Amino acid sequence: MSKTILRVEDLSVRFRTEEGVFNAVDNISFTLEEQKTLAIVGESGSGKSVTSLAIMQLLAENGHISSGEIYVDDENILNMSSSQVQHNILGKKISMIFQEPMTALNPILKIGDQITESIIEHQGTGKKEAYEIALDTLKQVGIPSPEQRIKQFPHELSGGMRQRVMIAMALVTRPKIMIADEPTTALDVTIEAQILNLIEQLKSTFKTSILFVTHDLNVVADIADDVIVMYCGQIIERGPVVDIFENPQHPYTKGLLATMPTLEDHKGELPTIQGGVPSITQRPGGCYFHPRCPHRMKKCETQSPGVYTVGQQQVKCFLFEGNKEERNDGK
Amino acid sequence: MFKKNSFYDFAYRRFTRNRLAVIGFAVTLFFVIMALFAPLIAPHEPSEFFFVEGQNVYDKYAAPSSEHLLGTDSLGRDVFSRLVYGARVTMMVALLAVSISTVIGTVIGLLSGYFGKIIDNIFMRLVDIVISFPVLFLLISISTIMDPSIWIVIFAIGFVSWTSTARLVRAEVLRVKELDYIAAARACGTSNLKIIVKHILPNILAPIMVQVTIGTAQAILMEASLSFLGVGVQQPTPSWGNMLMDAQKLLVLRDMPWIWIPPGVVNLLLVLAIYFVGDGLRDAFDSRQ
Protein backbone atom coordinates (compact mmCIF):
# COMPACT_ATOMS: atom_id res chain seq x y z
CA MET A 1 0.00 0.00 0.00
CA SER A 2 1.57 3.23 -1.05
CA LYS A 3 1.53 6.35 1.01
CA THR A 4 -1.27 8.88 0.77
CA ILE A 5 0.12 12.22 -0.23
CA LEU A 6 -3.01 14.29 -0.66
CA ARG A 7 -6.23 13.69 1.19
CA VAL A 8 -9.31 15.79 0.61
CA GLU A 9 -12.16 15.29 3.04
CA ASP A 10 -15.71 16.54 2.75
CA LEU A 11 -14.62 19.52 0.74
CA SER A 12 -17.31 22.02 -0.16
CA VAL A 13 -16.68 25.18 -2.08
CA ARG A 14 -19.28 27.88 -2.00
CA PHE A 15 -19.74 30.75 -4.41
CA ARG A 16 -21.66 33.91 -3.73
CA THR A 17 -23.48 35.16 -6.79
CA GLU A 18 -26.19 37.66 -7.55
CA GLU A 19 -28.78 34.92 -7.24
CA GLY A 20 -27.55 33.56 -3.94
CA VAL A 21 -24.99 31.22 -2.48
CA PHE A 22 -24.23 27.94 -4.22
CA ASN A 23 -22.03 24.94 -3.68
CA ALA A 24 -19.81 24.56 -6.70
CA VAL A 25 -18.17 21.60 -5.02
CA ASP A 26 -20.38 19.58 -2.75
CA ASN A 27 -18.87 17.46 -0.02
CA ILE A 28 -16.27 15.59 -1.99
CA SER A 29 -13.53 13.38 -0.60
CA PHE A 30 -10.69 11.65 -2.34
CA THR A 31 -7.10 10.65 -1.83
CA LEU A 32 -4.06 10.77 -4.03
CA GLU A 33 -1.41 8.13 -3.46
CA GLU A 34 2.29 8.64 -3.85
CA GLN A 35 3.46 8.49 -7.46
CA LYS A 36 -0.01 7.85 -8.79
CA THR A 37 -2.09 9.78 -11.22
CA LEU A 38 -5.63 10.57 -10.25
CA ALA A 39 -7.82 11.97 -12.98
CA ILE A 40 -10.85 14.12 -12.26
CA VAL A 41 -13.21 13.96 -15.21
CA GLY A 42 -16.34 15.93 -15.85
CA GLU A 43 -18.09 18.31 -18.19
CA SER A 44 -17.74 22.06 -17.91
CA GLY A 45 -19.38 23.20 -14.71
CA SER A 46 -18.89 19.90 -12.93
CA GLY A 47 -16.64 21.47 -10.34
CA LYS A 48 -13.44 19.74 -11.39
CA SER A 49 -11.42 22.92 -11.90
CA VAL A 50 -12.87 24.52 -8.79
CA THR A 51 -11.63 21.51 -6.83
CA SER A 52 -8.08 22.01 -8.07
CA LEU A 53 -8.22 25.76 -7.52
CA ALA A 54 -9.52 25.19 -3.99
CA ILE A 55 -6.54 22.98 -3.21
CA MET A 56 -4.21 25.68 -4.56
CA GLN A 57 -6.20 28.35 -2.69
CA LEU A 58 -6.64 30.24 -5.90
CA LEU A 59 -10.41 30.58 -5.74
CA ALA A 60 -11.93 33.74 -7.15
CA GLU A 61 -12.91 36.42 -4.67
CA ASN A 62 -16.54 35.34 -4.45
CA GLY A 63 -15.66 31.72 -3.72
CA HIS A 64 -14.54 30.13 -0.50
CA ILE A 65 -14.07 26.73 1.07
CA SER A 66 -17.10 26.38 3.29
CA SER A 67 -16.18 23.09 4.90
CA GLY A 68 -13.77 20.21 4.68
CA GLU A 69 -10.13 19.43 5.13
CA ILE A 70 -7.23 19.22 2.74
CA TYR A 71 -4.29 17.22 4.01
CA VAL A 72 -0.95 17.51 2.30
CA ASP A 73 1.53 15.12 3.88
CA ASP A 74 -0.90 14.67 6.77
CA GLU A 75 -1.04 18.38 7.48
CA ASN A 76 -4.34 20.17 7.06
CA ILE A 77 -3.45 23.16 4.92
CA LEU A 78 -6.77 24.80 5.68
CA ASN A 79 -5.58 25.27 9.26
CA MET A 80 -2.49 27.13 8.15
CA SER A 81 -2.22 30.86 7.74
CA SER A 82 -2.07 32.11 4.20
CA SER A 83 1.60 33.00 4.52
CA GLN A 84 2.39 29.52 5.84
CA VAL A 85 0.62 28.00 2.87
CA GLN A 86 2.47 30.33 0.57
CA HIS A 87 5.87 29.53 2.09
CA ASN A 88 5.55 25.83 2.79
CA ILE A 89 2.98 24.44 0.42
CA LEU A 90 2.45 26.32 -2.80
CA GLY A 91 5.22 25.84 -5.27
CA LYS A 92 7.07 23.70 -2.77
CA LYS A 93 4.88 20.68 -2.11
CA ILE A 94 2.15 21.30 -4.66
CA SER A 95 2.49 23.03 -7.95
CA MET A 96 0.17 23.56 -10.82
CA ILE A 97 0.20 23.47 -14.60
CA PHE A 98 -2.38 25.67 -16.22
CA GLN A 99 -4.56 25.12 -19.21
CA GLU A 100 -3.44 27.99 -21.40
CA PRO A 101 0.30 28.08 -21.98
CA MET A 102 -0.26 31.23 -24.00
CA THR A 103 -1.48 33.23 -21.03
CA ALA A 104 0.02 31.48 -18.04
CA LEU A 105 3.48 32.90 -18.63
CA ASN A 106 4.22 36.52 -17.84
CA PRO A 107 4.77 38.13 -21.25
CA ILE A 108 7.44 40.58 -20.17
CA LEU A 109 9.64 38.30 -18.07
CA LYS A 110 12.20 36.05 -19.65
CA ILE A 111 11.69 32.31 -19.32
CA GLY A 112 14.63 32.04 -16.97
CA ASP A 113 13.31 34.68 -14.57
CA GLN A 114 9.98 32.92 -14.31
CA ILE A 115 11.42 29.48 -13.65
CA THR A 116 13.96 30.64 -11.10
CA GLU A 117 11.34 32.59 -9.17
CA SER A 118 10.05 29.71 -7.10
CA ILE A 119 13.52 28.27 -6.50
CA ILE A 120 14.70 31.56 -5.06
CA GLU A 121 11.46 31.89 -3.11
CA HIS A 122 11.52 28.42 -1.58
CA GLN A 123 15.09 27.27 -1.45
CA GLY A 124 16.84 30.52 -0.78
CA THR A 125 19.43 29.81 -3.42
CA GLY A 126 21.35 32.54 -5.14
CA LYS A 127 20.41 33.74 -8.58
CA LYS A 128 23.24 31.94 -10.29
CA GLU A 129 22.55 28.61 -8.68
CA ALA A 130 18.83 28.92 -9.36
CA TYR A 131 19.67 29.62 -12.97
CA GLU A 132 21.67 26.39 -13.18
CA ILE A 133 18.77 24.41 -11.70
CA ALA A 134 16.37 26.06 -14.13
CA LEU A 135 18.62 25.20 -17.04
CA ASP A 136 18.79 21.62 -15.88
CA THR A 137 15.02 21.40 -15.54
CA LEU A 138 14.51 22.87 -18.99
CA LYS A 139 16.73 20.10 -20.34
CA GLN A 140 14.65 17.51 -18.54
CA VAL A 141 11.39 18.76 -20.00
CA GLY A 142 12.91 18.37 -23.43
CA ILE A 143 13.50 21.94 -24.50
CA PRO A 144 16.11 22.06 -27.23
CA SER A 145 19.05 24.46 -26.73
CA PRO A 146 17.88 25.55 -23.27
CA GLU A 147 20.82 27.94 -22.87
CA GLN A 148 19.29 30.03 -25.59
CA ARG A 149 15.63 29.54 -24.64
CA ILE A 150 16.16 30.56 -21.05
CA LYS A 151 16.98 34.08 -22.23
CA GLN A 152 13.92 34.38 -24.44
CA PHE A 153 10.50 35.83 -23.89
CA PRO A 154 7.35 33.67 -23.86
CA HIS A 155 6.08 34.99 -27.20
CA GLU A 156 9.20 33.67 -28.89
CA LEU A 157 8.18 30.10 -28.04
CA SER A 158 5.53 27.87 -29.57
CA GLY A 159 2.54 26.64 -27.59
CA GLY A 160 4.07 23.23 -26.96
CA MET A 161 7.34 24.79 -25.86
CA ARG A 162 5.54 27.12 -23.51
CA GLN A 163 3.68 24.23 -21.95
CA ARG A 164 7.04 22.53 -21.42
CA VAL A 165 8.25 25.70 -19.75
CA MET A 166 5.15 25.66 -17.55
CA ILE A 167 5.92 22.09 -16.58
CA ALA A 168 9.51 23.05 -15.85
CA MET A 169 8.23 25.89 -13.66
CA ALA A 170 6.00 23.46 -11.81
CA LEU A 171 8.68 20.84 -11.33
CA VAL A 172 11.69 22.96 -10.60
CA THR A 173 11.22 22.77 -6.85
CA ARG A 174 10.56 19.01 -6.98
CA PRO A 175 7.05 19.16 -5.55
CA LYS A 176 5.33 16.01 -4.33
CA ILE A 177 2.07 16.84 -6.01
CA MET A 178 1.49 18.35 -9.38
CA ILE A 179 -2.00 19.55 -10.29
CA ALA A 180 -2.55 19.66 -14.00
CA ASP A 181 -5.67 21.56 -14.98
CA GLU A 182 -6.42 20.51 -18.55
CA PRO A 183 -2.78 21.00 -19.51
CA THR A 184 -3.21 19.77 -23.05
CA THR A 185 -6.59 21.19 -23.99
CA ALA A 186 -5.08 24.20 -25.73
CA LEU A 187 -2.57 22.14 -27.68
CA ASP A 188 -2.98 20.26 -30.92
CA VAL A 189 -3.09 16.49 -30.89
CA THR A 190 0.50 15.68 -31.76
CA ILE A 191 1.84 18.11 -29.21
CA GLU A 192 -0.71 16.81 -26.72
CA ALA A 193 0.70 13.31 -27.07
CA GLN A 194 4.23 14.61 -26.53
CA ILE A 195 3.25 16.55 -23.43
CA LEU A 196 1.37 13.60 -21.97
CA ASN A 197 4.38 11.37 -22.54
CA LEU A 198 6.55 13.95 -20.89
CA ILE A 199 4.28 14.21 -17.84
CA GLU A 200 4.22 10.44 -17.57
CA GLN A 201 7.98 10.23 -17.80
CA LEU A 202 8.60 13.07 -15.37
CA LYS A 203 6.23 11.50 -12.88
CA SER A 204 8.66 8.62 -12.44
CA THR A 205 11.88 10.66 -12.60
CA PHE A 206 10.66 13.21 -10.08
CA LYS A 207 8.54 10.77 -8.04
CA THR A 208 5.58 13.11 -8.22
CA SER A 209 1.91 12.40 -7.79
CA ILE A 210 -0.39 13.97 -10.31
CA LEU A 211 -3.91 15.25 -9.98
CA PHE A 212 -5.06 15.49 -13.55
CA VAL A 213 -8.15 17.53 -14.28
CA THR A 214 -9.64 17.04 -17.71
CA HIS A 215 -12.77 16.52 -19.74
CA ASP A 216 -10.94 14.45 -22.30
CA LEU A 217 -11.54 10.76 -21.73
CA ASN A 218 -8.86 9.69 -24.19
CA VAL A 219 -6.30 11.50 -22.10
CA VAL A 220 -7.62 9.86 -18.96
CA ALA A 221 -7.28 6.42 -20.46
CA ASP A 222 -3.73 7.28 -21.38
CA ILE A 223 -2.43 8.69 -18.19
CA ALA A 224 -4.54 7.93 -15.11
CA ASP A 225 -4.29 5.20 -12.48
CA ASP A 226 -7.56 6.10 -10.83
CA VAL A 227 -10.50 8.12 -12.03
CA ILE A 228 -13.06 10.32 -10.34
CA VAL A 229 -16.11 11.29 -12.34
CA MET A 230 -17.71 14.52 -11.22
CA TYR A 231 -21.14 15.88 -11.99
CA CYS A 232 -22.57 19.09 -10.57
CA GLY A 233 -19.95 19.35 -7.88
CA GLN A 234 -20.37 15.79 -6.68
CA ILE A 235 -18.35 12.67 -7.24
CA ILE A 236 -20.72 10.23 -8.90
CA GLU A 237 -18.32 7.42 -9.66
CA ARG A 238 -14.77 6.48 -8.88
CA GLY A 239 -12.49 3.55 -9.40
CA PRO A 240 -9.35 2.28 -11.10
CA VAL A 241 -9.07 3.48 -14.67
CA VAL A 242 -9.41 0.01 -16.18
CA ASP A 243 -12.66 -0.73 -14.36
CA ILE A 244 -14.15 2.64 -15.16
CA PHE A 245 -13.44 2.22 -18.85
CA GLU A 246 -14.24 -1.48 -19.17
CA ASN A 247 -17.18 -1.54 -16.90
CA PRO A 248 -18.71 1.84 -16.11
CA GLN A 249 -21.61 1.67 -13.68
CA HIS A 250 -23.17 5.07 -13.29
CA PRO A 251 -25.51 5.97 -16.16
CA TYR A 252 -23.62 9.25 -16.57
CA THR A 253 -20.24 7.55 -16.87
CA LYS A 254 -21.73 5.09 -19.33
CA GLY A 255 -23.11 7.97 -21.34
CA LEU A 256 -19.77 9.79 -21.29
CA LEU A 257 -17.88 6.76 -22.49
CA ALA A 258 -20.43 6.10 -25.20
CA THR A 259 -19.75 9.56 -26.61
CA MET A 260 -16.11 8.70 -27.21
CA PRO A 261 -15.47 8.15 -30.90
CA THR A 262 -13.55 5.00 -31.72
CA LEU A 263 -11.47 4.12 -34.73
CA GLU A 264 -13.48 1.00 -35.51
CA ASP A 265 -17.01 2.17 -36.07
CA HIS A 266 -18.08 4.79 -38.48
CA LYS A 267 -21.77 4.49 -37.93
CA GLY A 268 -22.72 8.08 -38.54
CA GLU A 269 -23.69 10.28 -35.65
CA LEU A 270 -21.98 10.01 -32.31
CA PRO A 271 -24.15 9.20 -29.34
CA THR A 272 -24.75 12.05 -26.91
CA ILE A 273 -26.16 12.48 -23.43
CA GLN A 274 -29.51 14.23 -23.62
CA GLY A 275 -29.62 17.72 -22.19
CA GLY A 276 -26.80 19.66 -20.60
CA VAL A 277 -25.20 20.20 -17.22
CA PRO A 278 -27.69 22.27 -15.23
CA SER A 279 -26.31 25.62 -14.18
CA ILE A 280 -25.29 25.97 -10.58
CA THR A 281 -28.34 28.11 -9.89
CA GLN A 282 -30.81 25.61 -11.32
CA ARG A 283 -29.81 22.24 -10.00
CA PRO A 284 -32.71 19.79 -9.77
CA GLY A 285 -33.74 18.16 -6.52
CA GLY A 286 -32.77 14.59 -5.67
CA CYS A 287 -30.04 13.12 -7.84
CA TYR A 288 -28.63 15.98 -9.91
CA PHE A 289 -28.43 13.71 -12.93
CA HIS A 290 -32.01 12.46 -12.95
CA PRO A 291 -33.42 14.77 -15.64
CA ARG A 292 -30.90 13.36 -18.10
CA CYS A 293 -30.83 9.81 -16.82
CA PRO A 294 -32.29 6.99 -18.94
CA HIS A 295 -32.81 4.83 -15.81
CA ARG A 296 -34.42 7.38 -13.54
CA MET A 297 -36.83 6.18 -10.90
CA LYS A 298 -39.41 8.02 -8.87
CA LYS A 299 -37.17 8.54 -5.87
CA CYS A 300 -34.33 9.95 -7.95
CA GLU A 301 -36.37 13.11 -8.21
CA THR A 302 -36.54 13.68 -4.48
CA GLN A 303 -33.69 11.84 -2.77
CA SER A 304 -29.97 12.08 -3.28
CA PRO A 305 -28.54 8.59 -3.70
CA GLY A 306 -25.90 7.16 -1.38
CA VAL A 307 -22.63 5.71 -2.55
CA TYR A 308 -22.56 2.00 -3.25
CA THR A 309 -19.70 -0.34 -3.98
CA VAL A 310 -19.69 -2.21 -7.25
CA GLY A 311 -16.58 -4.32 -7.68
CA GLN A 312 -13.64 -1.93 -7.46
CA GLN A 313 -15.83 1.07 -8.04
CA GLN A 314 -17.96 3.33 -5.91
CA VAL A 315 -21.07 4.64 -7.53
CA LYS A 316 -23.51 7.28 -6.36
CA CYS A 317 -26.69 5.89 -7.87
CA PHE A 318 -29.87 4.18 -6.67
CA LEU A 319 -29.47 1.45 -9.28
CA PHE A 320 -26.99 -0.18 -6.93
CA GLU A 321 -28.95 0.22 -3.75
CA GLY A 322 -28.72 -3.49 -3.02
CA ASN A 323 -24.94 -3.28 -2.85
CA LYS A 324 -22.90 -2.36 0.16
CA GLU A 325 -23.39 1.25 1.05
CA GLU A 326 -20.28 3.28 1.66
CA ARG A 327 -21.24 6.65 2.98
CA ASN A 328 -23.98 8.97 2.15
CA ASP A 329 -21.77 11.79 1.11
CA GLY A 330 -19.27 10.35 -1.28
CA LYS A 331 -16.33 8.95 0.66
CA MET B 1 18.31 50.13 -27.70
CA PHE B 2 16.12 47.56 -25.94
CA LYS B 3 16.58 43.82 -25.60
CA LYS B 4 15.81 42.41 -28.98
CA ASN B 5 12.24 41.23 -29.50
CA SER B 6 11.18 42.41 -26.08
CA PHE B 7 7.91 44.24 -25.62
CA TYR B 8 9.72 47.57 -25.48
CA ASP B 9 11.72 46.78 -28.58
CA PHE B 10 8.52 46.36 -30.59
CA ALA B 11 7.02 49.46 -28.99
CA TYR B 12 10.13 51.46 -29.87
CA ARG B 13 9.87 50.39 -33.48
CA ARG B 14 6.19 51.31 -33.63
CA PHE B 15 6.88 54.67 -31.99
CA THR B 16 9.58 55.62 -34.45
CA ARG B 17 7.24 54.86 -37.35
CA ASN B 18 4.73 57.42 -36.02
CA ARG B 19 5.75 60.72 -37.61
CA LEU B 20 3.68 63.00 -35.38
CA ALA B 21 5.04 61.34 -32.25
CA VAL B 22 8.61 61.70 -33.46
CA ILE B 23 8.07 65.39 -34.24
CA GLY B 24 6.51 65.82 -30.82
CA PHE B 25 9.47 64.11 -29.26
CA ALA B 26 11.89 66.33 -31.16
CA VAL B 27 10.08 69.50 -30.09
CA THR B 28 10.00 68.32 -26.48
CA LEU B 29 13.67 67.47 -26.67
CA PHE B 30 14.37 70.94 -28.08
CA PHE B 31 12.73 72.57 -25.06
CA VAL B 32 14.48 70.20 -22.66
CA ILE B 33 17.83 71.16 -24.16
CA MET B 34 16.85 74.80 -23.97
CA ALA B 35 16.07 74.36 -20.29
CA LEU B 36 19.25 72.43 -19.54
CA PHE B 37 21.56 74.86 -21.31
CA ALA B 38 19.67 78.03 -20.43
CA PRO B 39 22.76 79.96 -19.23
CA LEU B 40 24.49 79.27 -22.54
CA ILE B 41 21.53 80.19 -24.71
CA ALA B 42 20.12 83.20 -22.89
CA PRO B 43 21.97 86.42 -23.75
CA HIS B 44 21.18 88.02 -20.38
CA GLU B 45 20.35 87.13 -16.82
CA PRO B 46 16.59 86.55 -16.50
CA SER B 47 16.17 89.08 -13.71
CA GLU B 48 18.58 91.68 -15.00
CA PHE B 49 17.01 95.13 -15.36
CA PHE B 50 17.88 97.25 -18.33
CA PHE B 51 17.97 101.00 -18.36
CA VAL B 52 17.27 103.44 -21.09
CA GLU B 53 20.58 104.55 -22.57
CA GLY B 54 22.16 107.26 -20.46
CA GLN B 55 19.13 107.67 -18.14
CA ASN B 56 18.22 106.29 -14.77
CA VAL B 57 14.95 104.88 -16.10
CA TYR B 58 14.05 101.24 -16.71
CA ASP B 59 13.89 100.35 -20.37
CA LYS B 60 10.29 99.10 -20.10
CA TYR B 61 8.28 97.61 -22.92
CA ALA B 62 11.07 97.94 -25.44
CA ALA B 63 10.18 96.52 -28.83
CA PRO B 64 12.26 93.62 -30.18
CA SER B 65 15.70 94.67 -31.35
CA SER B 66 19.10 93.11 -31.86
CA GLU B 67 19.91 93.87 -28.24
CA HIS B 68 16.65 92.35 -26.94
CA LEU B 69 15.45 89.71 -29.40
CA LEU B 70 11.94 89.66 -28.00
CA GLY B 71 11.98 93.07 -26.41
CA THR B 72 11.67 93.79 -22.70
CA ASP B 73 8.82 93.44 -20.27
CA SER B 74 7.08 95.77 -17.84
CA LEU B 75 10.15 95.94 -15.59
CA GLY B 76 12.72 96.23 -18.33
CA ARG B 77 13.87 92.62 -18.32
CA ASP B 78 14.89 90.73 -21.45
CA VAL B 79 11.89 88.66 -22.57
CA PHE B 80 13.94 86.15 -24.56
CA SER B 81 16.22 85.39 -21.61
CA ARG B 82 13.25 85.00 -19.33
CA LEU B 83 11.65 82.70 -21.85
CA VAL B 84 14.74 80.48 -21.91
CA TYR B 85 15.06 80.38 -18.15
CA GLY B 86 11.30 80.01 -17.83
CA ALA B 87 11.55 76.69 -19.67
CA ARG B 88 13.64 75.47 -16.75
CA VAL B 89 11.18 76.50 -14.11
CA THR B 90 8.14 75.35 -16.01
CA MET B 91 9.64 71.93 -16.71
CA MET B 92 10.99 71.48 -13.24
CA VAL B 93 7.60 72.27 -11.75
CA ALA B 94 5.85 69.95 -14.18
CA LEU B 95 8.28 67.05 -13.78
CA LEU B 96 8.47 67.18 -10.00
CA ALA B 97 4.71 67.54 -9.69
CA VAL B 98 4.17 64.60 -12.04
CA SER B 99 6.71 62.51 -10.13
CA ILE B 100 4.80 63.14 -6.93
CA SER B 101 1.43 62.41 -8.48
CA THR B 102 2.72 59.31 -10.28
CA VAL B 103 4.24 57.82 -7.16
CA ILE B 104 1.17 58.48 -5.04
CA GLY B 105 -1.23 57.42 -7.79
CA THR B 106 0.64 54.25 -8.63
CA VAL B 107 1.03 53.08 -5.05
CA ILE B 108 -2.59 53.78 -4.20
CA GLY B 109 -3.82 52.27 -7.45
CA LEU B 110 -1.76 49.11 -6.94
CA LEU B 111 -2.91 48.58 -3.37
CA SER B 112 -6.49 49.43 -4.19
CA GLY B 113 -6.71 47.16 -7.21
CA TYR B 114 -4.75 44.25 -5.78
CA PHE B 115 -6.22 43.98 -2.32
CA GLY B 116 -9.69 45.27 -3.15
CA LYS B 117 -12.43 45.20 -0.55
CA ILE B 118 -12.06 47.72 2.27
CA ILE B 119 -8.69 49.06 1.16
CA ASP B 120 -10.12 49.75 -2.26
CA ASN B 121 -13.13 51.44 -0.75
CA ILE B 122 -11.10 53.72 1.47
CA PHE B 123 -8.71 54.78 -1.28
CA MET B 124 -11.40 55.31 -3.87
CA ARG B 125 -13.40 57.51 -1.51
CA LEU B 126 -10.20 59.45 -0.90
CA VAL B 127 -9.91 59.88 -4.65
CA ASP B 128 -13.47 61.18 -4.77
CA ILE B 129 -12.67 63.71 -2.07
CA VAL B 130 -9.51 64.94 -3.76
CA ILE B 131 -11.26 65.23 -7.13
CA SER B 132 -13.91 67.39 -5.50
CA PHE B 133 -11.33 69.89 -4.19
CA PRO B 134 -11.63 73.30 -5.79
CA VAL B 135 -7.93 73.37 -6.64
CA LEU B 136 -7.71 77.01 -7.59
CA PHE B 137 -9.31 78.30 -4.42
CA LEU B 138 -7.27 75.89 -2.38
CA LEU B 139 -4.08 77.26 -3.89
CA ILE B 140 -5.15 80.85 -3.59
CA SER B 141 -5.87 80.33 0.09
CA ILE B 142 -2.61 78.45 0.63
CA SER B 143 -0.62 81.18 -1.05
CA THR B 144 -2.24 83.83 1.10
CA ILE B 145 -1.54 81.92 4.30
CA MET B 146 1.95 80.68 3.52
CA ASP B 147 4.84 82.42 1.84
CA PRO B 148 4.35 81.57 -1.79
CA SER B 149 7.14 79.46 -3.16
CA ILE B 150 7.77 77.24 -6.10
CA TRP B 151 7.59 74.19 -3.82
CA ILE B 152 4.05 74.93 -2.82
CA VAL B 153 3.09 74.97 -6.49
CA ILE B 154 4.87 71.68 -7.09
CA PHE B 155 3.32 69.89 -4.13
CA ALA B 156 -0.08 71.39 -4.76
CA ILE B 157 -0.18 70.19 -8.35
CA GLY B 158 1.28 66.82 -7.31
CA PHE B 159 -1.21 66.25 -4.52
CA VAL B 160 -4.29 67.10 -6.53
CA SER B 161 -3.44 65.36 -9.79
CA TRP B 162 -2.62 61.82 -8.62
CA THR B 163 -6.26 60.76 -8.76
CA SER B 164 -6.41 59.98 -12.46
CA THR B 165 -3.22 57.91 -12.19
CA ALA B 166 -4.65 56.05 -9.21
CA ARG B 167 -7.84 55.23 -11.05
CA LEU B 168 -5.99 54.17 -14.16
CA VAL B 169 -3.56 51.96 -12.24
CA ARG B 170 -6.38 50.42 -10.23
CA ALA B 171 -8.30 49.53 -13.38
CA GLU B 172 -5.18 48.05 -14.96
CA VAL B 173 -4.43 46.00 -11.85
CA LEU B 174 -7.98 44.68 -11.83
CA ARG B 175 -7.48 43.55 -15.40
CA VAL B 176 -4.02 42.05 -14.98
CA LYS B 177 -4.57 40.32 -11.66
CA GLU B 178 -7.18 38.01 -13.20
CA LEU B 179 -4.74 36.79 -15.82
CA ASP B 180 -3.39 33.28 -15.71
CA TYR B 181 0.21 34.24 -15.11
CA ILE B 182 -0.70 35.94 -11.86
CA ALA B 183 -2.49 32.77 -10.75
CA ALA B 184 0.56 30.83 -11.92
CA ALA B 185 2.86 33.05 -9.88
CA ARG B 186 0.62 32.62 -6.86
CA ALA B 187 0.64 28.86 -7.41
CA CYS B 188 4.43 29.02 -7.16
CA GLY B 189 4.10 30.50 -3.68
CA THR B 190 5.17 33.98 -4.70
CA SER B 191 4.45 36.63 -2.06
CA ASN B 192 1.93 39.40 -2.64
CA LEU B 193 4.61 42.07 -2.66
CA LYS B 194 6.61 40.21 -5.28
CA ILE B 195 3.53 39.60 -7.40
CA ILE B 196 2.73 43.30 -7.31
CA VAL B 197 6.24 44.53 -7.96
CA LYS B 198 7.54 41.88 -10.31
CA HIS B 199 4.48 40.67 -12.18
CA ILE B 200 1.83 43.36 -12.11
CA LEU B 201 3.73 46.64 -12.13
CA PRO B 202 5.94 45.88 -15.16
CA ASN B 203 2.88 44.76 -17.08
CA ILE B 204 1.01 48.01 -16.51
CA LEU B 205 4.02 50.28 -16.98
CA ALA B 206 2.96 51.18 -20.49
CA PRO B 207 -0.31 52.91 -19.57
CA ILE B 208 1.45 54.54 -16.62
CA MET B 209 4.04 56.00 -18.98
CA VAL B 210 1.30 57.36 -21.22
CA GLN B 211 -0.34 58.84 -18.16
CA VAL B 212 2.96 60.43 -17.11
CA THR B 213 3.34 62.24 -20.42
CA ILE B 214 -0.23 63.46 -20.42
CA GLY B 215 0.11 64.40 -16.75
CA THR B 216 3.21 66.44 -17.58
CA ALA B 217 1.35 68.39 -20.22
CA GLN B 218 -1.48 69.02 -17.79
CA ALA B 219 0.92 70.08 -15.06
CA ILE B 220 2.50 72.60 -17.42
CA LEU B 221 -0.91 74.04 -18.17
CA MET B 222 -1.81 74.06 -14.51
CA GLU B 223 1.41 75.84 -13.59
CA ALA B 224 0.73 78.37 -16.32
CA SER B 225 -2.77 79.14 -15.12
CA LEU B 226 -1.75 79.30 -11.46
CA SER B 227 1.17 81.59 -12.20
CA PHE B 228 -0.95 83.70 -14.50
CA LEU B 229 -3.31 84.28 -11.60
CA GLY B 230 -0.39 85.16 -9.38
CA VAL B 231 -0.62 82.19 -7.02
CA GLY B 232 1.94 80.04 -8.79
CA VAL B 233 5.57 80.72 -9.45
CA GLN B 234 6.40 84.14 -8.02
CA GLN B 235 8.43 86.99 -9.45
CA PRO B 236 11.30 87.44 -10.04
CA THR B 237 11.61 83.73 -10.92
CA PRO B 238 10.53 83.49 -14.55
CA SER B 239 8.03 80.90 -15.65
CA TRP B 240 5.98 80.76 -18.81
CA GLY B 241 2.90 81.23 -16.74
CA ASN B 242 3.91 84.34 -14.85
CA MET B 243 5.37 85.89 -17.98
CA LEU B 244 1.82 85.92 -19.27
CA MET B 245 0.75 87.98 -16.28
CA ASP B 246 1.76 91.15 -18.07
CA ALA B 247 -0.94 90.39 -20.60
CA GLN B 248 -3.51 91.15 -17.94
CA LYS B 249 -2.87 94.80 -18.76
CA LEU B 250 -4.96 95.89 -21.69
CA LEU B 251 -2.17 98.08 -23.00
CA VAL B 252 0.23 95.15 -23.18
CA LEU B 253 -2.39 92.87 -24.67
CA ARG B 254 -3.23 95.35 -27.36
CA ASP B 255 0.07 96.97 -28.26
CA MET B 256 2.95 94.78 -27.08
CA PRO B 257 2.49 91.29 -28.49
CA TRP B 258 6.20 90.48 -28.04
CA ILE B 259 5.66 90.24 -24.32
CA TRP B 260 2.88 87.69 -24.21
CA ILE B 261 2.87 85.89 -27.57
CA PRO B 262 6.22 84.09 -27.11
CA PRO B 263 5.47 82.53 -23.71
CA GLY B 264 1.98 81.63 -24.90
CA VAL B 265 3.27 80.03 -28.07
CA VAL B 266 6.04 78.01 -26.42
CA ASN B 267 3.56 76.84 -23.81
CA LEU B 268 1.18 75.70 -26.50
CA LEU B 269 3.97 74.10 -28.53
CA LEU B 270 5.39 72.15 -25.61
CA VAL B 271 2.02 70.92 -24.37
CA LEU B 272 1.02 69.91 -27.88
CA ALA B 273 4.33 68.15 -28.44
CA ILE B 274 4.00 66.23 -25.19
CA TYR B 275 0.46 65.19 -26.09
CA PHE B 276 1.74 63.90 -29.42
CA VAL B 277 4.39 61.92 -27.60
CA GLY B 278 1.71 60.56 -25.26
CA ASP B 279 -0.51 59.54 -28.15
CA GLY B 280 2.47 57.96 -29.88
CA LEU B 281 3.35 56.01 -26.76
CA ARG B 282 -0.20 54.80 -26.37
CA ASP B 283 -0.27 53.52 -29.93
CA ALA B 284 3.21 52.05 -29.63
CA PHE B 285 2.30 50.11 -26.50
CA ASP B 286 -0.89 48.81 -28.04
CA SER B 287 0.36 45.48 -29.27
CA ARG B 288 -2.81 44.81 -31.24
CA GLN B 289 -1.50 46.99 -34.04
Regions found by a protein language model. Give the residues of each.
Chain B
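Short hydrophobic alpha-helical segments within the ABC transporter permease transmembrane module
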Residues: R82-V84, L126, V169, V173, ...
